[in-house]
Structure formats: C-alpha cells, structure tokens
Amino acid sequence: METNYLKRCFGNCLAQALAEVAKVRPSDPIEYLAHWLYHYRKTAKAKEENREKKIHLQEEYDSSLKEMEMTEMLKQEEYQIQQNCEKCHKELTSETVSTKKTIFMQEDTNPLEKEALKQEFLPGTSSLIPGMPQQVPPSESAGQIDQNFKMPQEINYKEAFQHEVAHEMPPGSKSPF
C-alpha cells in the first residue's frame, strides 16, 4: 500500500531519487534524499512556470497577430471606402460640371433665340439665317418657286450681313464695308 501511494504521488521522482542515493552512497542518505527531492521539486516548479509562461506568451502572440490582421483588414476596408468615396465624388463633380455646362449652353442660346425672334418680327428684315438650310413655306407651289434660290453653301455671307446691317443703320450713315 505504501509503495502504491509513493508511486502514485511521487512516481518517477522517487525512483530517480533512490537511484541517485544508491549511486552516490552519502553518509546520511535520508538528508541527501530530502535535499534531492527539494531540488527536484524546485526545478519541476520552474519548468512548470516556464511552460505556463510560454503558453501565455504564445496566447499573447496569437492575440496580437489577430489584432494586426484586424487592423490590416480595417485599413484595407477604409482604403476601399475612400476609393469609393473618391469615385463617387468624381462622378458627382463630372455630373455637376456637365449639368453646369448644359445650363450654361442653354443660357447662351437663349439670347441668340431671343435675337432671332426679335429680327423675325422686325419689318423689312430677312427671316433667312445665313449658313442654315432654309425651307420653303408650304403655301408656295412648286411652279412658283424662284429659280434664283440659293443653297446655304452659295450664300455670300458678306452680302447677307450687309443686308442685315443696312436695316439696322440710321439713314445717311456709311456702310462699314
């Protein structure tokens, strides 16, 4: 019974201690055995602490590695969000620019349209716009069309401009041409 208890509690430790006592043959084997067991327990405790310390360090390393991975993933996600924001911003600015251009173009054409309408209603002004294809009013029949009708390519722009300017000039003034 004592042997089983010693084996179970001390196991290999006691067997090594007795082997060491038999090998050294000290003058006081019991005191030697006590010192040897004390030293064995001290080294076993140090080994256990080292093992726990290694486990703790490994856990810290794993957690810091996970934290670094999470940080990297967050940075990558932040970079993607920033890229998407820049892309959306570029799209919005291009849409804004195109909208502003459209508004500007519409604002630019409004004075021209008003001027054309104004000239159309002035007495003695020509409704022909130089450089633009002209349509014959539907009231004229095909046989009554003037044979001297010129295509837009054939119109002398200088003559057309002089004609328009002559109507706007006060009587008795000289033509700039």
From Swiss-Prot:
It comes from the Eukaryota. Pfam families: Dpy-30. GO terms for cellular component: Set1C/COMPASS complex. Belongs to the dpy-30 family. This is DPY30 domain-containing protein 2.
